């Protein structure tokens, strides 16, 4: 994107900026979704063996964070996608989502899924997912469909 020199990095969650962006993500989930329907992971949850986290940086500033949870040899789940407010609409989230999709293909996955909320604040993310080919579909894994969540899938 013009004016930005984004770099994607594998993220071990040790950076204070990454921690702050994850905290902002969790705060947003709590504000827009009843707590019993929030499935966002905190830093300890994102450290699971089957989860990889990446972040997008513009110089020394974090622009976005996102994760890939391996559900099986062929299916993955997008987790904790969040752009920093200063970088919303600047392409960092799209760059990261495309990176996760490419990594999933490289890993031999054939399907990516995600669970997200229904509040209007989720609309920018939903637009991004749709533009990248994700389609609405059924609940997956241990999720249950309800009035506060929705599910999207991408066949790779």
What spans do the regions from the language model cover?
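Acetyl-CoA-dependent GNAT
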Residues: 3-75, 79, 84, 97-98, ...
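Conserved acetyl-CoA-binding loop-helix of GNAT-fold acetyltransferases
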Residues: 83, 89-102, 127-131
């Amino acid at each position: 994107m013009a004016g930005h020199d984004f770099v994607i990095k594998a993220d071990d969650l040790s950076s204070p900026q990454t921690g702050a962006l994850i905290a902002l993500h969790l705060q947003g989930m709590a504000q827009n979704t009843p707590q019993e329907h929030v499935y966002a992971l905190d830093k300890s949850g994102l450290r699971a063996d089957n989860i990889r986290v990446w972040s997008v940086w513009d110089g020394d500033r974090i622009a976005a964070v996102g994760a890939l949870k391996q559900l099986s040899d062929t299916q993955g789940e997008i987790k904790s996608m969040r752009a920093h407010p200063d970088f919303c609409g600047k392409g960092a989230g799209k760059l990261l989502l495309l990176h996760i999709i490419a990594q999933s293909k490289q890993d031999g996955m054939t399907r990516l899924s995600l669970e997200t909320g229904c509040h209007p604040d989720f609309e920018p993310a939903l637009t991004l997912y749709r533009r990248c080919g994700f389609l609405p579909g059924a609940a997956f894994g241990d999720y249950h469909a309800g009035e506060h969540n929705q599910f999207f899938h991408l066949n790779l």
